[in-house]
Amino acid sequence: MDQETLPRTATEPMPAGDSDRFINRELSWLAFNSRVVAAAENPRYPLLERLRFISISGSNLDEFYSVRVAGLIGQARAGLALRSSDGLTPTQQLGEINRCARALMETQQRVLGTVLAELAGAGLTIIAPHELNEADRAFLDQHFMERVFPVLTPLAIDPAHPFPFVQNMGLVLALKLIRQEDSGVMRALIPLPAQIRRFIRLPDPSPETIRFVKLEDLVILFLDRLFHGFRLAGSGLFRVCRDTDVEFEEEAEDLVQSYETALKRRRRGAAIELTLAADLPDDLRTLVIDEVEAPEDQLFVEPGMLGLVDLKEMIVDDRPELLFPAYTPRFPERIRDFGGDCFAAIRNKDIIVHHPFESFDVVVQFLRQAASDPNVVAIKQTLYRTSRDSPIVGALIEAAESGKSVTAMVELRARFDEEANIRLARALEAAGVQVVYGFLGLKTHAKLSLVVRREGSAMRAYAHFGTGNYHPITARIYTDLSFFTCDQQLTRDAARLFNYMTGYARPEQMDQLVYSPITTRRVIAALIDAEIEAARAGRPSGIWLKLNSLVDERLIDHLYRASAAGVPVSCVVRGICCLRPGVPGLSENIRVKSIIGRFLEHARIAVFANGARMPDRENKVFISSADWMARNMDWRVETFVPIHNPTVHAQVLDQIMAVDLRDDVDSWTLGPDGVWTRVLPGDPPVSAHEYFMTNPSLSGRGSALRGPLTQQQRDQIRYRKTFLTND
């Protein structure tokens, strides 16, 4: 693929003012979504996967507007002059967002047009009503009357029928109708329910031909069933995005009831963005704009498709050649070596599981075994996000019903999962689980399980520390780490952290575990300072980071100081990055890359040289639930877990981090001007995701791997010298 970049490059030292030290957070997020859209242009990816990337980018942009843009609009309306890290006021940020978002939307539509054209060449099409044959119309007639007509609500708009409330992300068909008996004009709306599929698949004899009809076209096709005696004079879609940020009353006597009330308010949030189809007649456009009352600068006229998130409905299973090859995650051989006994495997040695390349089933099995094991006396579990029919929740309920002491720390404020978490909390309570909701003013984002088991005359604790949610569905596509241990110090620390979450009892000490909001920031600062001292003393130094977001100004400034001292810093940041790398006099020793590929990068890893070249057994390695953002350091409960076991240490350092740094197939690099440039594949090309799919992990190999790593084994997974931070 040709290199993608912008022509700007920084050749002179940049002044170290705030606006030059930091990249704007919101614009960095839009740049991330642009990389997602660029993935849809990647000819290496199968066509339906490219369509999926467009759908994901649409969903991302919807959430961005409903949360981030909504917050800035609220600040601007309130007259707040709060400035971003790069010195912009809310109004200035909204102007820049508007400019970048419009360009992004144009790119989305252009790429969508290309992908749909290529899909048509492969036999998968969206067809217009005039392309339907008699058999198609007969099928759609029945489909409409049985599945669509009963749930549609046509709404006339006149003094007796006021303009209705349009739900968040609601797609509405606006109509201009002519009454046939007197030529009178009527305007009407038909909200298209989200519960109905937007793309209706037509029956075809072979999957080699797949045809879809859009719901809005189906409604127009049978409009006479809804408005008999009228003819259509004009129509078009519009879509409303509403403010979904919600403030919870932390001091309420009944926290759950308070949250339910707040969630009802969210459904009627202020309109933040209004997108109108370009073919919407002028008089209907004026009506919609006047009634919806979205900000004037957040009105978008779209000549292409509205509601790109719905494109995911076109991703069918019966055209496997248009999808990524099916991949079955490996189950760790280490567990199999012990007959599926998770506790025996963990007692033998710590184990880390690399999702989705290794199955999330091992996490489920760990908790199911705990639930059914008569020697297990207690289970403690955090829950931030999980699936509707979660096997994790099922295991906790089974354990409680069998008489075990079960505690679940359920975070009610996981954005867009609040209602689901309220439901599961009630289900857990009904089964006898002790449910707690954590801290007022703090979100519990740590991913932690603790199982206490009677073994002989003693009690032994087993812990699971994760970087991702206990969600078996997202675990199929998110890259995350699950660390299992029965180390006495770590499990004791886990128990202390649970006591902190349930009883507000701040631990007097922690043996190994670092946690937010108390010690993470301080420990990270000390680790960076140690690298600065090593560099100044002429000893090996270096920092490797793998994060979703790098935003915190204080930590970024600390990395700048490390760079100035000569510490080489390499960062793999999937999403937002406010740090400017490669700026002479500020960050010339810092490199930042991003991997956007088949799987969503989600694990958080931090590595510090600790006086040794990298990678080396002496390097300090941590995995974490926390990104480097102020909220993760100061306003959330998070874990920052040291890795000591040699095999686990080698897997995280020599295998995962090394290969991520080496990837040149799905990678982008960030320049000092804030521009992301696609990395050109080498010869041979290196894909981190393909490597992890085809190479067993070191920790999970069990009997296939005995003893410490040999130098040859380390060399086999060594990254290319171009990414070596200690050259």
Swiss-Prot record:
InterPro entries attached to this UniProt entry: PP_kinase, PP_kinase_C_1, PP_kinase_middle, PP_kinase_middle_dom_sf, PPK_C_dom2, PPK_N_dom, PPK_N_dom_sf
Alphabetized UniProt keyword annotations: ATP-binding, Kinase, Magnesium, Metal-binding, Nucleotide-binding, Phosphoprotein, Transferase
Active site location: H445
Positions of Mg(2+) binding: R385, R415
Cellular compartments per GO CC: polyphosphate kinase complex
A Pfam family the protein falls into: PP_kinase_C
Annotated ATP binding sites: N60, Y478, R574, H602
Cofactor names: Mg(2+)
UniProt function note: Catalyzes the reversible transfer of the terminal phosphate of ATP to form a long-chain polyphosphate (polyP).
HAMAP family: Polyphosphate_kinase
Family: Belongs to the polyphosphate kinase 1 (PPK1) family.
Protein name in the entry: Polyphosphate kinase
Protein encoded by which gene: ppk
